[in-house]
């Protein structure tokens, strides 16, 4: 198959490009190279003759028209991915995460190809997620009432029946939500094969995490290089399900090969109930694995629209694609630490 990957020099896009190439597929990556770490992925691509790169910005329709490659599927990985930055510059989130997607959809319509889109767990509002009864333990929030029921939620996590309405999605979440609905509409109106994945926490090697995004890898990097760590609210008891990038790649291969039989479908995708951690649990886990003393952690106020618990119910995607995550959080962290300890990777920016 032939793949066009937008945001192809980023963490998800770059890893998918390599995985697809190693599976024998042809890949064109496009990226505006605005994200730190992009240059490292470009270096990786040089080892693969079937990965090509074009400097391109999806916000620019003329850039998209320069693409001569005709893919079978577009993997739409481009985004401004930081949930908190949009409050400072909402238009930047909108142009990257919503308006640019329209250009990608029009490209798909003109080239008669499918699209797989990276949406977000922020499609579901913080108000809804935090309305589920919960209590605190020493290290995490836990759902409380075994008899409680709500549309879009069970003790396996949040499922696709959840309402996209409500407040506190974050600006980032709203722009991804809008793109999510746009893709559903374009797919229906113009017969574009589409699959939407509402992703939870994705992590793994080659993720240049930072304070505001990519927190699992950021914590590992900060601990290795002695940078200050902060818990933003709730003493780090917020819980997420975590999915390793290799498991995501295996799912994308299955979805790409079956996109026509899952036309217009959307899925919650993450590590699921078996792969969860709180922020402070992750910090303690890394201390043990890295054999370091616990660094002092500053507690600051919570971020707006933060979900105290978000765990994906992956029943639907698991059933329809015969897919489940294979890499445990423990094994996934070991892969991250192995990459961080690779002397050939440039981490000089974190020391500045």
Show the residue positions of the predicted features:
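Short, solvent-exposed loop/helix junctions and linker helices
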Residues: 6, 95-98, 172-173, 209, ...
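Conserved sequence/active-site signature of Rossmann-fold short-chain dehydrogenase/reductase
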Residues: 59, 123-124, 202-204, 248, ...
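C-terminal substrate-binding subdomain of Rossmann-fold SDR/epimerase-dehydratase oxidoreductases
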Residues: 16-22, 221-352
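N-terminal Rossmann-like NAD(P)+-binding domain of SDR-like oxidoreductases, especially those catalyzing
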Residues: 1-200, 335
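Short, charged helix-to-loop "capping" segments that act as catalytic/coupling loops
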Residues: 35-40, 62-71, 115, 166-168, ...
């Amino acid at each position: 198959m032939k793949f066009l990957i937008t945001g192809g020099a980023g963490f998800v896009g770059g890893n998918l490009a390599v995985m697809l190439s190693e599976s024998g597929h042809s890949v064109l990556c496009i990226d505006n190279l605005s994200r730190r770490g992009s240059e490292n992925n470009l270096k990786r691509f040089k080892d693969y003759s079937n990965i090509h790169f074009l400097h391109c910005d999806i916000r620019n329709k003329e850039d998209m028209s320069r693409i001569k490659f005709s893919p079978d599927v577009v993997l739409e990985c481009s985004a401004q991915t930081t949930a908190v930055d949009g409050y400072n510059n909402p238009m930047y989130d909108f142009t990257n995460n919503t308006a640019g997607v329209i250009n990608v959809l029009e490209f798909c319509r003109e080239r008669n190809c499918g699209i797989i889109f990276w949406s977000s767990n922020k499609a579901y509002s913080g108000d809804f997620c935090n309305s589920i009864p919960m209590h605190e333990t020493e290290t995490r929030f836990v759902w409380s009432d075994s008899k409680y029921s709500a549309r879009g939620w069970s003790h396996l996590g949040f499922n696709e029946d959840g309402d996209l309405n409500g407040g506190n999605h974050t600006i980032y979440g709203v722009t991804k939500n809008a793109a999510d609905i746009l893709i559903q509409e374009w797919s229906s109106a113009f017969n574009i094969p589409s699959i939407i994945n509402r992703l939870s926490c994705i992590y793994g090697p080659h993720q240049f995490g930072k304070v505001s995004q990519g927190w699992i890898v950021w914590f590992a990097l900060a601990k290795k290089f002695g940078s200050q760590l902060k818990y933003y609210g709730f003493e780090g008891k917020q819980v997420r399900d975590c999915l390793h990038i290799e498991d995501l790649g295996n799912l994308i291969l299955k979805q790409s090969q079956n996109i026509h039989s899952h036309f217009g479908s959307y899925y919650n995708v993450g590590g699921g109930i078996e792969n969860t951690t709180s922020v402070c649990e992750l910090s303690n886990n890394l201390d043990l694995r890295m054999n370091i003393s616990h660094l002092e952690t500053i507690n600051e106020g919570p971020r707006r629209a933060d979900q105290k618990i978000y765990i994906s119910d992956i029943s639907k995607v698991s059933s329809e694609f015969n897919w489940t995550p294979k890499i445990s959080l423990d094994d996934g962290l070991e892969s991250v630490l192995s990459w961080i300890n690779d002397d050939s990777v440039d981490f000089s920016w974190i020391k500045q």
